[in-house]
């Protein structure tokens, strides 16, 4: 509902935005960007992005590969260099890079309306599915059948996170100082409970300082928009982003909606490194801070998000719905899910529409790349923390936090270990890490196996 409302509001403002937002077609007309073929119609582009949204399973790597196939290989709507520059730019941004890449491609082809259409079509199919699954989970999650299915899903999710850890580490830890950044990040979040935003800022500052100066080749054309246009774009989208939160503060009777709007707005600014990285911070706040969900429910939500199309960060919608449902039932749950979607994805349009004209310029700024690389190294430590946090809460029924001065350590009760989860996790590790089975297949097999074990025991 929130996304539909956003579409209607934006359509009403398109004429206003057109004054301040320069489309990709306008940039090309000025000769500031590389040429690329244009789709025959807006309908063709919308159909292509709808196909991407419906088939975008398997996480960002698979989603980006699908977009490359459709946008570059099949239709030649973007050149290889344009696609890679846009991907590098989206990797610099907080939020789901695949959704932002789709938004950029739509913007480049058909301006603001194209960007909105592409971004919404990427998100809406998965958002609808997640909402339906969250409703089923809220009403029937305590049934033995559902509990058995999620026994296997939790074990599979644990190995999926470990697999993500290996992949990010292989890409990010290319020098000793990045290993150091990862280690400091892990100690900071696991033993000192430092907030994730602080870790991101510290890593970005370190990477910015150790990087070299900008390249002074003079080969990069300046952006095709003025600073005034960019500032106006930022202002418009900040108003669109923040207006619902202001209204909630003024009129909402349920404090949970205000808390959700503020928390997930903050989360949208620091979601560097993908959903896995920010899950640790989100779990820390949602489980221990607000008390909206239990640790097991966080695992269940991630498992559901892994099996649906769209960005993995849609797990936030699951969290928002359950938070609202737990306080005020279905109506408040739906409202909370809408608020969560709004403040999670509206910022993505802000980043793209404000920053897209600067992509070629940014690709030649090594300090920005250095900051991103250091953040990615820190993400390795954060995902390691997430892996241990998930493992302890999935395998052990009882965990105690022991405080040693400024340090805090989670101490499990080894007698409370669930051997069924251990067996399922080992099986998932073999299939996913050794034989490289697909994530949806492993999740479905783990769910069926979990149900069987739960029934037998």
Each model region followed by its residue ranges:
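Intrinsic low-complexity, disordered N-terminal segments enriched in polar/charged/small residues
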Residues: 3-5
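Conserved beta-loop-alpha segment that forms the PLP phosphate-binding cup at the N-terminus of a helix
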Residues: 100
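Multi-pass membrane proteins that catalyze or facilitate reactions on polyprenyl-/lipid-phosphate substrates
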Residues: 11-93, 104-308, 312-457
């Amino acid at each position: 509902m929130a996304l539909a409302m956003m579409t209607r509001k934006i359509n009403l403002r398109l004429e206003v935005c057109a004054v301040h937002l320069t489309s990709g077609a306008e940039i090309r007309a000025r000769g500031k960007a590389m040429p690329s073929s244009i789709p025959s119609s807006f309908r063709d582009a919308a159909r292509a992005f709808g196909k991407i949204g419906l088939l975008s399973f398997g996480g960002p790597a698979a989603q980006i590969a699908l977009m490359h196939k459709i946008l570059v290989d099949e239709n030649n709507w973007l050149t290889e260099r344009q696609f890679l520059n846009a991907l590098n730019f989206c990797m610099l941004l907080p939020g789901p890079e695949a959704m932002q890449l789709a938004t950029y491609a739509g913007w480049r082809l058909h301006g603001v309306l194209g960007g909105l259409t592409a971004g919404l079509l990427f998100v809406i199919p998965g958002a609808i599915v997640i909402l339906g699954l969250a409703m089923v989970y809220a009403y029937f999650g305590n049934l033995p059948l559902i509990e058995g299915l999620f026994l296997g899903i939790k074990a599979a999710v644990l190995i999926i996170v470990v697999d993500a850890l290996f992949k990010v580490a292989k890409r990010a830890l290319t020098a000793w100082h990045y290993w150091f950044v990862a280690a400091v990040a892990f100690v900071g979040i696991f033993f000192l409970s430092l907030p994730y935003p602080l870790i991101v800022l510290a890593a970005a500052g370190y990477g910015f300082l150790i990087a070299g100066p900008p390249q002074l080749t003079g080969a990069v054309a300046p952006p095709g928009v003025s600073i005034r246009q960019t500032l106006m774009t930022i202002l418009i989208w900040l108003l669109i982003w923040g207006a619902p939160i202001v209204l909630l503060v003024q009129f909402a009777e349920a404090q949970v909606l205000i808390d959700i709007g503020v928390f997930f707005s903050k989360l949208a600014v620091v979601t560097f490194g993908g959903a896995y990285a920010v899950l640790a911070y989100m779990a820390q706040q949602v489980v221990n801070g607000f008390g909206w969900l239990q640790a097991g429910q966080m695992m269940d939500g991630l498992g559901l998000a892994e099996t649906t199309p769209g960005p993995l960060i849609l797990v936030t919608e699951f969290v928002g719905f359950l938070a609202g449902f737990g306080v005020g039932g279905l109506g408040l749950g739906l409202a909370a899910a809408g608020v969560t979607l709004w403040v999670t994805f509206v910022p993505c349009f802000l980043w793209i529409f404000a920053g897209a004209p600067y992509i070629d310029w940014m690709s030649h700024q090594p300090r920005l790349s250095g900051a991103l690389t250091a953040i990615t190294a820190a993400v390795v430590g954060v995902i390691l923390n997430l892996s241990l946090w998930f493992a302890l809460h999935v395998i052990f029924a009882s965990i105690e936090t022991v405080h040693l001065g400024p340090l805090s350590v989670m101490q499990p009760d080894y007698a409370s270990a669930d051997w069924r989860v251990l067996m399922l996790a080992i099986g998932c590790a073999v299939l996913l890490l050794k034989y490289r089975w697909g994530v949806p297949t492993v999740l479905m097999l783990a769910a069926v196996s979990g149900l069987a074990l739960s029934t037998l025991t």
